[in-house]
């Protein structure tokens, strides 16, 4: 009878321990909605990583990338997230200053210059205005032309809630510096609306509610690959185009640090990177072969990018400057 009791106790302990390990082998990733959507890169990346890690990947998505850091700050050390994936270089110092992230100590072979030890890039792109060349026959060839023309209507994103919206703010600041407020005053006459995120604005553009929409130089690749149309084009401005580098980082509060580190290493793998050009419609950070559609894109050789510390120190003032110009 005593032996039977010991056997039953051992079975119960084994089942309890197995459940504990099963729960611990879940990797929770906070990201933005389009990354985790069924048409985004998330599902395929989840399947590929789960095959390798014998674990479960769970995406927790917010409406846009700019709100990711806010969500983590509100949750603090009680956050269920292991990894944050989706904000860009303009939030690096803000994120580091929360003291919620840990250095990843990962060596990656990137095709962009990167020196931050808390966050690793997973894709990059350049902002541009997208237009339909069957509707807009004479697109602007410079930011100056766009600012000064009176026959174009555009849709852009709010810099307080959207990373592309903030990107436009920094793009204009990079070109015009102290003259940015007067530029915004002129530009506002052309802006149909500011949307909270990219998805809303691009949808409105596709419904012909404006001549152009703020997006990326890579956006036409989507229409080439999935709609077999080349009528959507990206503007090419002589002043250059502002860059966006999207990153991922591990939280100190992660209950599965080794698994999180494994995923961070997985980011630079072919399995992860091959999903970026076709599903996230951005450039990969590794030298994989790009789809044919990307060979037809215009990518500016003049890449504009501000030091993250300068952005951190000035962002609030520049947003207030933008608000006052409305």
Q: Which residue stretches match the model-derived regions?
A:
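A ligand-binding cleft/hinge motif common to bilobed small-molecule-binding domains
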Residues: 90-94, 206-231
């Amino acid at each position: 009878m005593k032996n039977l009791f010991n056997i039953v106790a051992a079975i119960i302990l084994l089942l309890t321990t197995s459940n504990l390990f099963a729960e611990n082998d879940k990797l929770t990733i906070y990201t933005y909605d389009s990354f985790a959507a069924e048409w985004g890169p998330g599902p395929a990346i989840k399947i590929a990583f789960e095959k390798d890690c014998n674990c479960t990947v769970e995406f927790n998505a917010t409406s846009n990338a700019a709100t990711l850091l806010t969500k983590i700050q509100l949750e603090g050390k009680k956050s269920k997230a292991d990894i944050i994936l989706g904000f860009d270089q303009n939030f690096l110092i803000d994120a580091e200053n929360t003291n919620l992230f840990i250095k990843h100590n990962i060596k990656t072979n990137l095709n962009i210059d990167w020196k931050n030890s808390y966050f690793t890039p997973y894709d990059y792109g350049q902002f541009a205005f997208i237009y339909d060349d069957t509707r807009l026959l004479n697109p602007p060839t410079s930011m100056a032309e766009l600012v000064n023309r009176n026959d174009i209507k555009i849709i852009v994103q709010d810099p307080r809630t959207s990373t592309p919206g903030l990107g436009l703010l920094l793009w204009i600041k990079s070109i015009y510096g102290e003259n940015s407020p007067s530029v915004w005053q002129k530009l506002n006459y052309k802006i149909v609306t500011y949307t909270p995120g990219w998805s809303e604005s691009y949808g409105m553009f596709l419904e012909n509610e404006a001549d152009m929409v703020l997006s990326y130089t890579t956006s036409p690749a989507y229409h080439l690959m999935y709609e077999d149309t080349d009528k959507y084009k990206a503007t090419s401005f002589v002043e250059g185009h502002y860059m966006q580098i999207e990153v991922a980082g591990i939280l100190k509060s992660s209950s599965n640090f080794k698994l999180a580190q494994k995923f961070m290493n997985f980011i630079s793998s072919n399995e992860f990177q091959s999903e970026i050009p076709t599903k996230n419609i951005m450039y990969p950070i590794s030298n994989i072969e790009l789809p044919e559609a990307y060979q037809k894109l215009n990518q500016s050789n003049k890449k504009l990018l501000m030091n993250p510390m300068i952005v951190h120190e000035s962002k609030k003032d520049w947003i207030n400057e933008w608000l006052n110009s409305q």
